[in-house]
Amino acid sequence: MDAQEAERAGLVSRVVPLERLMEEALGAALMICEFSHIAVMAAKESVNRSFEGTLNDGIMFERRMFHALFATQDQKEGMDAFVNKRKAVFTNT
């Protein structure tokens, strides 16, 4: 399977020319750095755990993470920023 086929199948979100690969990857990393670090860690752990256990186990884990994240200050900040159409300033708490 080549990159274009993987994109059509939904396995990758975007295909870029090799000469722009590092620029695009760094741009994605910078964007992720602007998110709540707590939420990014939870998302990464959810993806890593998706390879372990059953689909139901994964759904239950994601549900627990969702509820845990709802108790954070970053969740409140993110919602307030969204409602007030401003950029969120996360404190990672």
Predicted features by range, described:
Residues 71-75, 81:
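Interdomain hinge/lid region at the active-site interface
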Residues 2, 9-60, 67, 73, ...:
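C-terminal long alpha-helix characteristic of the crotonase
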